[in-house]
From Swiss-Prot:
A single Gene Ontology CC term: cytoplasm
Top-level taxon: Bacteria
Localization of this protein: Cytoplasm
Sequence similarity: Belongs to the UreE family.
Gene (name only): ureE
Main location: cytoplasm
Name of the protein: Urease accessory protein UreE
Length: 165
């Protein structure tokens, strides 16, 4: 069995030797037994706290196997809207419910849920149930790569904003 232990950002001269197609629930896991798309057995033994993204490369300890992760199409609800204010309202209401959310210009996507679909329709949005890869924002599962940390040597002063009239 191939044991994938490393994320590879620059494969150099290594050639991709296989792919694995995973839904978002599997891409959240750091320990997982899986079957590559060509039928070979493999295991994930990765650091915790990182959502695998479609296109990421994984390797075994000695670099013999380089595997590309593919995001599997899955049941999602997709909202497309040209009105940024309406889209922001939808994102607010979904975020208030802690829904993992994929955000792109003019588009919101989340794992299909008919109750959430109805809520968004009530806001005046059109919601499509479809099969598509789901790539939620990093904040739902992990801190974003190269994100801002507050573990540094200075304070952020509190600023009181004036009350709205």
């Amino acid at each position: 069995m191939i044991v994938l232990t490393r994320r590879i950002s620059d494969p150099g001269t290594l050639a991709v030797s296989g792919t694995v197609t995973l839904d978002v629930d599997s891409r959240i896991k750091s320990r997982l037994r899986l079957t590559l798309d060509d039928g070979r057995e493999a295991g994930l033994m990765l650091e915790r706290g990182h959502l695998l993204r479609g296109g990421e490369l994984l390797a075994d300890a000695d670099g013999t196997h380089l595997i590309r992760v593919l995001a599997a199409p899955e049941a999602v609800s997709t909202v497309r809207c040209a009105d940024p204010h309406l889209l922001a309202r939808a994102a607010y209401h979904l975020g208030n419910r802690h829904v993992p959310l994929q955000i792109e210009p003019g588009l919101l996507r989340f794992q299909h849920d008919h109750v959430l679909d109805d809520m968004l329709r009530g806001l005046g949005l059109t919601v499509e149930a479809e099969q598509a890869p789901f790539e939620p924002e990093a904040g739902a599962y992990q801190s974003a790569p190269h994100g801002h940390s507050h573990a540094h040597g200075h304070d952020h002063p509190f600023v009181r904003l004036p009350a709205h009239s």
